A protein has these predicted regions:
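Catalytic and substrate-binding clefts that recognize carbohydrates or anionic sugar/phosphate headgroups
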Residues: 1-124
């Protein structure tokens, strides 16, 4: 099932080509906040793996690292980089629960996937 949640007053980015009506209330998974800008936070179980973010550095499981989605044109793609050119703001959490999130946001997003706190993922 696909649900769409809208926060603030977004403009059309054409990243999603199918019309999906906005859902009311809060998602069933994680917590969204707009108090100090946008943020999404969820707990991660010990065996949860996190996949996605397109061509981001590191291995296929993105857990345990910090990623910045900022579309920076930097040719030196090494393990210590937190941001590459393309922004693929889609993640899948696989483990006790299987759920995916797409963040249609044209600005900078920070994906802290168990980096600051090993059992917490925060997107802000």
């Amino acid at each position: 099932m696909v649900k769409k949640f809208v926060y603030g007053t977004p403009f059309e980015t054409e990243a999603v080509v199918k019309e999906i009506p906005s859902s009311e209330g809060n998602p069933d998974y994680g917590t969204f906040s707009t108090e100090n800008g946008f943020s999404f936070t969820t707990k991660l179980a010990d065996d949860d793996m996190v996949f996605g973010l397109g061509e981001a550095n590191r291995g296929i499981n993105k857990r345990g690292f910090l990623y910045i989605s900022d579309c920076a044109d930097d040719p030196n793609h090494v393990e210590s980089k937190t941001s590459l050119y393309a922004a693929h703001n889609f993640i899948i959490i696989s483990g006790e629960t299987h759920v995916g999130f797409f963040f249609d946001y044209p600005g900078t997003l920070r994906f802290d996937i168990g980096y600051t706190t090993s059992d917490t993922m925060t997107v802000s």
